[in-house]
């Protein structure tokens, strides 16, 4: 079963409180999501493999550690996932970026893929899928389905807030995908919104309604 990592780091929790705050404006909201994305990336990549390399300092030669040849890709779920992407790239600037676009079918209420663009050598990459919210889990599950169909093997999912229902659904659908969460919330309400949540992340990021 996939591991669920809920971050209690003081900086993450401090910034998340302002992200949740209704009065936080678009500019500050965007900056905070970027910052938390960067802080979370530090923890999400904690188990990346390192290789020994020989380097020369101004004083002497030594054996140092560098990331192994495994390639990393960040995949935001459009559109809200874009808000977390730059923060991750600040920590891993060499990472490639894929995109997955999903919309909800008005009749079935199921997510439908309308766009997907991935880096080459997909089988050789570690993927970090990012989306600010994990509510029912439908979008995350479909995005990961899309990656696996294209050959992805190692996938992690990273979000700001999650409902227990979404975590359970994602674990059931993809027990091999670890889940990284800044805030695990109480529940979904009758309309499928995370409670207490942070509102509509996409609208708050881009100043739309």
UniProtKB/Swiss-Prot annotation:
Its cofactor is Mg(2+). GO terms for biological process: UMP salvage; uracil salvage. Pathway: Pyrimidine metabolism; UMP biosynthesis via salvage pathway; UMP from uracil: step 1/1. Allosterically activated by GTP. Binds 1 Mg(2+) ion per subunit. The magnesium is bound as Mg-PRPP. Uracil binds at residues 194, 199-201. PANTHER family: ADENINE PHOSPHORIBOSYLTRANSFERASE, URACIL PHOSPHORIBOSYLTRANSFERASE, CHLOROPLASTIC. Belongs to the UPRTase family. This is Uracil phosphoribosyltransferase.
